[in-house]
Amino acid sequence: MLNDILSRVARVGAMHAGNRPNPPADRPQPCQGKPPTSPGKTIKHKSFLGALAGAVAGALVAAAVAAAAVFLVGVTGGLAVAAVGALAVFAAGDLISAVTNKVSAVVDSASPAFGPVASGSGNVFVEKQPVARATKDTVACTKHNSPQLIAQGSESVFVNDAPAARIDDKTVCGATLKEGASTVFFGSGQGTYLEIADEFSWWEKALLIAVEFLVPPSRGMLKGLGKLFTRNGLKSVLKGAKAGALFITKVPGKMGCAARAFKANKGMARFKEAAKAFKKDPVYLASGEVIESRTDIELGQTLPLVFERTYRSASAHTGLLGRGWHDSWSEVATVTHDGLNTHVVITLAQGYDIDFTFHQDVQAVYCPHYPEFTLHRRGDGFSLWHRDQQTWRDFSVVQGERRLLSAIHDSHDNRIELVRDPKGYLRQLRHSDGVTLLLVWQGEYLHQIQRIDGGQKTLLAEYRQDEQGRLVEANATHAYHLYYEYNTAHRLTRWHDNDQTWARYEYDAQGRCVYTTCADGFLTARFDYLPDRVVMTDGLGQRSEFGFNDLHLMSWEQSPLGHITRYEYDEVGNLLREISPAGRVVEFTYLDDTGRVSTFTDGSGHQWQYDYDDAQRLCGVTDPLGREWGWVYDAEGNPERLTGPDASEVRFTWNRYGLLTQVSDAAGEVQARLQYDHRQRLLSATDAESRTRQLRYDRQDRVVQWQRADGARFRLGYRRASWTLPEQLIRPDDKEEQRQYDRHNNLLSYVDGNGALWRQTFGPFDLLTARTDAEGRTWRYEYDRESQQLIAVTAPDGSRWQWWLDADGRVIRERDMTGTETHYGYDEDGLCIRVRNGEGDTRHFLYDARGLLLRETAPDDTLHYRYDAAGRLTEVSSATAHVQLDYDLRDRVVREWHNGTLLTRQYDDAARTVTRTLTWDGDADDTTGTLAPLTSLFHYTRTGELRQVQLPDGADLTLTHDAAGRESLRTGGSGFVQQREYDVMGWLTREQSGAQHDGRLQPAQTREYRYDGAGNLTGVRHNRDAEGYRLDATGRVQEMLSGGAGKPVDTTARFHYTRTGLPQEAGRLTEWQAGRLVQHDDTHYQYDRAGRLIRKQVVQPGYRPQVWQYRWDSRNQLRVVDTPNGERWLYRYDPFGRRVGKRCDQKAEETRYLWDGDQIAEIRHYRHGQLIQRRHWVYNGWELVVQQRQHTGGDWETDFVTSSQNGTPQALFTPDGTLRWQVPKATLWGQRQTEKSESPDPGLAFAGQLRDSESGLCYNRFRYYDPAGGCYVSPDPIGIAGGESNYGYVQNPNTRVDPLGLAGCAMGEILADADKWSLAKIGDRQKGMIKDKLSTVKERSKALNTKMREHFNANEQKIISEWEKQTGMNWPTLSSGSRATPHHVIPIKNGGSNEWWNIIPVQHPHTGTIHGTGSALRTHLPYQKDGGKLWNLLGY
């Protein structure tokens, strides 16, 4: 139901809860993330920016390349679980990805605003503005006139357990977040956490690049509502309206359509703009109509076979379903004659009419108001061409003046035949893919739709009408079951689902809706239709006003706080200019003869240009920097080649049905191959390393088996006929997982491989109201009645996290579970300009005309930001730091200067290598020659796994992978070897490391792993010692056991947990207050009003108390540590929040760090100002694989590192395989039993953690972790998106990590699940990169999530292309011929990045086990810990 509601634009809003801005804390590496967005920041619609889609070339390209696959999700049904993998979206290659990202990101950020981000984190701020989060926060979308949840966000940064929403992320309604912070960047990579309404048809998505200013009515976005509801009146209009005829005279050689002059309350020229006028459930303000739109059936592998129905309260039309209802199969052409002129009115499924006038001998007519449509004469009938969907509709069945729809087909001759009886009644639909539907009638109306091909007789939908011919019951058997009620005027007065969701409407004498309300008081509003405006008063008495022009397009809108946004159009309704409340302006120009966008100008005057071929297809895009992207199409209109600014190419091969079969580069190297069965369903996908995934289907085209490249098979079971979501999964190890859904596709329960049960409860509009874990702990969620934004979360112990909204729905105050409060302020455009923490420290933010952050002013420092014309960050400066960034043509950072250090990267795409060089100022003066720049060469496989690293001293490390793409062998130096073995589930079971002699490994270290049915680690054998774990139902450690060969089994530790999940070890005193550790044995903790640790005191009888003092800056960065022995340590950070140095004057010691992204690449130790030692680190993902040490004047010592599953280094081996160092024993939470010495010890703890001996803490990128207490010492920068506890570490440190100090996740389990469902093998390199970013996994604000989602949508193709380039594989294609869906491993909502390494191809992103309840990811990173509909959208 949620999906449906979302599509209706009306209630999408904040349904997914969680609308708190995220405090900016530290930022991800420059340019590897995106500026987070905040309440007030503008959003943009691709639909509105149809032409802008071209600007979003990147994402478009990817879509284009994957044309056939994009539609898969809707076509094949929710078989996602099994296919959720490699077949998702066939990327066009690195080129496309580069193009896509660039153009799309640029365009998204520059596109016109269609409302502001409405809410953000209540306790996380960036540049003093609440950080918006995906799945939690909403936007005030003017296109939909209702709160829309942010669907995308960072894949690596989470705020309050939600992915931080950033520029270019999208909302559920398809809008793109366009403005964000100017100095802060959150996690690279973009994750999609909520279903995004399709703003473009499958073809448009395939060629989003087409820069079309429209959003065809495919599955999604109002199911076509906001898209073609530009004409909201009755069909009665003036024939041959002169307006259209006059316009046509401007187009030589073409006879235009006579645009009908609609009556006063009707007629919007462009559906994109019309969508802005939808409010509440939804009500179309321009006319006062109530619109109810649903898609009951979606089938077909090539050409979509869709049954969409739309009710319009002012319509007199009678379709298959009854009075007032339009539908996909009742589309009709009505013909009249006027002298030599023939007038044809096409009535489409969404209930709008398009009027064409044929003059004598004219065979084709173009409509300027709907330039995507062209009508052709065909004998006595007509054919309607939709250029964006690349489909024809034939109207050839003659019934008087009417021509009934007889067929739908495309340029590949994929066809849907509508078979009618002599009276014109539709009896069957026959699809060339092999699908046959039978229509059963009851009297004059449609009663049932059955699928009868293959000997089946499956009921897909059933309808019932009353005696007056009004639809009163509609049962789409795979989803919702709805009931309708009408008044005496036959207007819809109420609909309900016979459960908890309903909506009610009241009308005035003119038939306009004047009042609406929904279940539990949601979406309540009263409408007043004044001569010059429409006034909407919501349930809280807050007043919004809207003005419309002569075309009934919204010309201005005023928010409850009085902020006015204005829109200007041309004579046919194309948006020319949008002016924000603060005066920010974006502009568009169009081609007269096609309506295509020709230029887009952002708020700073930078312009993008678009070129089209004779077929009106986008063939070129030029950005403000002069970079050009070009597309070439084959004779059938399929994108055949994409060329980027650097002259690189990606080539595509298609079969006769228009399905992608191969992706290759300019040299002819194949990246991917796809094969289909006789029904055009994807059978297999083979990557560049010849690894093949296979799929099998049932008669309803549902995936019933998915086989990985290594032969492991996963079987899917469906308990209900026509149900598209699998409710049973039989794994390769024969373990069974179960899921139960309600009729709205909401996941009610999940049973994992251990039999543990998780439950969820939903309220009206499918809002998550309660979640109960396998241990019986329940979290409850509350929402704002108007915006449906999350406003409160109640933990199992009764503690609450709350947010307060202003009249515009923006979070202005937040109080976390510890009572810490944060306040936010905004400008007219909704940009956060002020954030005040609990200590009263205020940070101010200033933005440019594009909404990019220019300056961040705080009591202790001021940061300045600069960007290039494309909106890329080029420079950041503060009182103590200066950072400069250079990019290549693919937007990759190739040079980064920072206060005397330089990091350069050289990319050789043909050789698949990256050369990294680290340089320090002053080294050139070194006379010993020992301080030469450090250059490392990284080699990758064709599928993106790290294959080899060549080190500065000449040593190398080589990684080998098995048939499934998992690392199986690691060799280095003259004799080091590590071997790995996996079980049928792909879980690591054995790892041996040591020296190789005479071709045989002589292990010095052997580690064996055991797991339970849910994939939780239950035992580790290290050589002759063993350690076991007894876990509770949720996977937390309850007991630690030790033993081994000849040793008795002893219990070494027992744990129990608070109601909120915080650990307490048996026999030790641990006191938590409101989620913060206040005492652990003899150690006492004290915090300031901003929730940061300021004093730690150890009191032992007979000893003087030992006291540590901590001081923080306004950005929550630890600056000073005073130790008990009188030492004072000072910490320095760069503008991105990375610690770049620490020093102690008392000891005359200093340490400096040079970063590569979010990882330290080199460390230099100084004493008395002299360099005494340096270390060089090389990572594979979040795992340290090489450490090199050099003492002053000495040679480099190279060690190869082995690590445990949680990233903790276990041992160092010399190049000849000799064991040099082993990690000391530590507690479950990382507290070592011995202190680090001057040994080769890297000084690392869990993944992403650097131990600081002076403070006893671990630096964790964005926070500091206390291993003694097993918790953080400051609030989570991303707030509730970071988890149920603002201070807690991961649930189980054996299997989960938090590399960035933002959110913990079970990396091993998550990656295993991802690999299991990916349609393409996930290489070690990709896994490593994912692991490396897991630390950033934090729930983003709705705004940030939306930004990230928008960014992903805009750059999808580019990202896919980059994935293809980095992995060496072709993006898989589904059985439908569509490309696999790109699925984020770490969801945007949880902080996932929109980067190639964070996406995998899957069959359906919203029904995959990887993100399903009970999955490793969802177990450790619940999509909506604070509520929302993400679970539903994911099908779990």
Swiss-Prot record:
Pfam families the UniProt entry points to: DUF6531, PAAR_motif, RHS_repeat
Keywords: Hydrolase, Membrane, Nuclease, Repeat, Toxin, Transmembrane, Transmembrane helix, Virulence
Superkingdom per UniProt: Bacteria
Residue stretches of each YD repeat: 486-521, 569-605, 612-647, 766-799, 847-879
GO cellular component: membrane
Molecular function (Gene Ontology), one example: toxin activity
Region Disordered, annotated ranges: 16-42
Membrane-spanning intervals of the chain: 48-68, 70-90
EC number in record: 3.1.-.-
UniProt subcellular location: Membrane
InterPro entries linked: DUF6531, HNH_nuc, PAAR_motif, Rhs_assc_core, RHS_repeat, T6SS_VgrG/RHS, YD
Membrane topology summary: Multi-pass membrane protein
Description of the deletion phenotype: A double rhsB-rhsIB deletion is outcompeted by wild-type cells, restoration of rhsIB restores normal growth in competition experiments. Restoration of growth requires the RhsB-specific immunity protein, rhsIA does not restore growth.
Family assignment from sequence similarity: Belongs to the RHS/WapA nuclease family.
Job of this protein: Toxic component of a toxin-immunity protein module, which functions as a cellular contact-dependent growth inhibition (CDI) system. This protein may be a nuclease that is specifically inhibited by its cognate immunity protein RhsBI. Upon expression of the C-terminus (residues 1284-1436) in E.coli growth is inhibited, cells elongate, nucleoids condense and plasmid DNA is degraded; these effects are blocked specifically by cognate immunity protein RshIB. Cell contact is necessary for growth inhibition.
Full protein name: Probable deoxyribonuclease RhsB
UniProt lineage: Bacteria, Pseudomonadati, Pseudomonadota, Gammaproteobacteria, Enterobacterales
